[in-house]
C-alpha cells in the first residue's frame, strides 16, 4: 500500500494525472492531479497564464512597432531620393573655389547643399602670398595659417589643393600652346625645304648631263698608236708605231 501511494503521489506523468496500480497492470487515472498541479493553486496558475499571455502580447506589439518603424524609414529614404533627383548618395563636399575676391566654396551645408565661403581681399592676398612661398604646407604651417585667416585647417588645405590643381592646369595649357606653335613652325619649314629640294633637283639635271658627256673624251690616234704591248710568249716589250707596222724593236729579256 505504501508503494502504491508513493507511486500515485509521484504520478510518473507530470503533464497528465497519476497512475493507479492495481495488481500487475497499471492504468491511468485522469481524475487524480499530478504533483506539479498539486504544488500550485488555481489562482497561481491563472496568474502565470495571464503573465505569459501579456508578455506574448508585448512582444507582438514591439515587433509590429519595429516593422512600422522600418517601413517608415524606407518611405522616408525613398521620398528623399525622389526629392534629390535620384541621387540618394549625395555627399557633403568641402571645397574652395577660385582664389579671387569671391573666394571659394566652403564646407557643405545642411541638406547636402554646397555653400560658398566668401574670402575677403586680405584673406585672398595672404593665401596667395603663402602659396608663392610654399605651395605645400606642413601640419604646423597649415594650422598657423588657418589661425591667421580665422578659417578651419581643412579649408586651408583644400584651398591649397585646388590652387595647385589650377596652377598645373594653366601650365599644361601653356605647354600645349607652345608645342602647337612649334609644330606649326616645323610644318611650314618642312614645306619650304621640300620646295627648295625640288628646285635643286630640277636645276641639277642639265648640269649632270653636261658633266657626264665631258667624261667620255676621244683619245688621239697618235696616242693610241704609242701604246705599249707585252708579248706573252717571249715576255718582250714591243712598241707599236703608226700605220700598224713594226718600226723598231727594243727587246729586253725578262727571263731569269
From Swiss-Prot:
User: Biased composition, Gly residues: where in the chain?
Assistant: 102-112
Q: List the stretches of this chain annotated as a DNA-binding region.
A: 112-171
Q: Do you know which Gene3D superfamilies this protein is assigned to? A: Homeodomain-like
Q: Name one GO molecular function term.
A: DNA-binding transcription factor activity, RNA polymerase II-specific
What are the subcellular locations of this protein?
A: Nucleus
PROSITE patterns hit by this protein: HOMEOBOX_1, HOMEOBOX_2
Q: Where are the stretches annotated Disordered?
A: 52-116
Q: In which tissues is it expressed?
A: Expressed in roots, leaf sheaths and blades and panicles.
Keyword DNA-binding present in the record's keywords: the answer is yes
Q: Which SMART domains match?
A: HALZ (SM00340), HOX (SM00389)
Sorted alphabetically, which keywords does the UniProt record give? Answer: DNA-binding, Homeobox, Nucleus, Transcription, Transcription regulation
The protein's superkingdom reads: Eukaryota
- List the residue ranges of the region (Leucine-zipper): 170-214
Which family is annotated?
Answer: Belongs to the HD-ZIP homeobox family. Class II subfamily.
Its name, as the record gives it, is Homeobox-leucine zipper protein HOX18
- Which species is this record about? Oryza sativa subsp. japonica (Rice)
The encoding gene:
HOX18
